[in-house]
Amino acid sequence: MVNVVLGAQWGDEGKGKLVDLLVGKYDLVARCAGGNNAGHTIVVDGVKYDFHMLPSGLVNPKSLNLLGNGVVIHVPSFFKELEDLETKGLNDARERLFISSRAHLVFDFHQRTDKLRELELSGASTDGKNIGTTGKGIGPTYATKASRSGIRVHHLVNDNPESWTVFENMYRRLLETRKKRYGDFEYDAEGELARFKKYKEDLKPFVVDSVVFMHKAIEAKKKILVEGANALMLDIDFGTYPFVTSSNTGIAGVISGLGIPPKVIDECYGVVKAYTTRVGEGPFPTEQLNEDGEKLQEIGAEYGVTTGRKRRCGWLDLVIMKYSTLINGYTSLNITKLDVLDTFKEIPIGIGYYYKGQKLDLFPEDLIKLGKVEVEYKVLPGWQQDITKVTKYDDLPENAKKYIKFIEDFVGVPVEWVGTGPSRDNMVHKEIQRI
């Protein structure tokens, strides 16, 4: 059994909370894409764990955890995050954590050039704005991967006598291309090489052939949960390009990032915030640059876990949700942070885009067009009462249930979970009919 949790908007939907709720049922939790540019927090028994690169399954003592071939690994951050978790009591994390030998390595010079690329890419955008990178070196690493000059984990940990020489030569060639690309590029290559000589032995116990690892688990009928990073609207192919991340963050990234066939995936859970947020630049049709937007930001505490940047806020956009569902094929939805809407008298929902008076059939790929659309809204009545103490779906206010029903009917996917507050216990389960 393979189930997948994916973000349905622009990230920060609260995927970690659903994973936290589900993880106790799974034998293996895997990440398939991204690096330490993601970020979410899980609270267990009053202890707060911050995850960026590592799978959330580490909080479950019975789960194995895998960073798949589609993940990019910044080794210093890997060990720092692992050590932070260990200091908070996850003492057996090292025994339950594995890394794909095919995963690519993020070097410090990737992070150094990330900001330089940000300045260049701003010139390629439609309005001269920055892309909004986290500066973690993720994009440059995927770029070297695509250009076939990247360095994989197995290049570092290989036991062949000449393996270090091969790794060092690859590293110097890769660094030289950075210097040629960016001119006067001062960098302590010898210092980083010395650190990686130590990492060679430190990393080795974690490394596995992830294709063999995954398929053995599937053949053994293990319960597997795939934890998606970012979200569909940040996908390199299907997101608001170029204001996206550098990997496939939808269902395609699960398949390519773990080396598994589509037929083994049983359920795909889409996580969607009850309103919409976005970090960084790029078009945002339902954004509210007014008191409503400020209220959503304040009540929702909308600041990024990884960057600390304030998130832009707006109403729920069901045009995006339909598009996201079309690509990812969600079998059920988790609506998060519904409680943030508790005090609103009326709640608009974006249900259509108009461009030059014509209604668009689908979310457009043209950002110039997207930046000029007029949004059609359906205004629903609010419930204006506190839902944070609700523990059963039937006990939600009628208008809250009507809000959820409207989403289900419009998108064509049942809602299975509803987030009703910030605590890990603030999640209401709704029975659905599975086909």
Swiss-Prot record:
Chain sites annotated for binding IMP: 12-15, 37-40, 134, 148, 230, 245, 309
Binding site for GTP: 11-17, 39-41, 311, 337-339, 419-421
Swiss-Prot/TrEMBL keywords: Cytoplasm, GTP-binding, Ligase, Magnesium, Metal-binding, Nucleotide-binding, Purine biosynthesis
Binding-site list for Mg(2+): 12, 39
Cofactor(s) listed in the protein's UniProt record: Mg(2+)
Amino-acid positions noted as binding substrate in the UniProt annotation, renumbered to this chain: 305-311
BP-aspect Gene Ontology terms: 'de novo' AMP biosynthetic process; IMP metabolic process
Stored SMART domains: Adenylsucc_synt
Gene Ontology, cellular component aspect: cytoplasm
EC number: 6.3.4.4
Protein known as: Adenylosuccinate synthetase
